[in-house]
Amino acid sequence: GEPYWDGGYCANPAVFPLFYDCASRDVMLVLLSPLRREGTPHTVQEIDTRIAELGFSAHFMREMRMFAHATAFADRPFIRWGRLERRLHTVRFHMIDSSGLANLERSDTKLLAHGPFLELLREQGRTRGQDWLAQHATAIGRHATLDVQACFT
């Protein structure tokens, strides 16, 4: 595929350009914050972390919910399929989740640009990527490994 970077440092890059403007039907989502957390935050640090996660992922979550709802809407029998509807039914979403990585649990690490820390994150990312490939490599180009409807609605 073709690498994509929006140049933003304050939030996730938009998914829609990958969906609409790229030739690849496979879209890999790499999460740096968990989609959901168990329990309610109580300490100042827990609340601060959750606020940062929600702010960081709000646009991404809204965009992915849009994909889920648009796909469900396009499934209605009276809808005549155009380019968007065809694309909704041929895109294959995949996701690598970072939950459980202690280095990303705290909100203060999101802005840490210390070389050794970034190298550690790179190695952890490679490990997660290799683990994902070991489980799902055969799905690439064939079918989605992420159920967008179940995950985002």
Where are the model-predicted features located?
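Non-catalytic peripheral regions of patatin-like phospholipases
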Residues: 2-4, 8-153
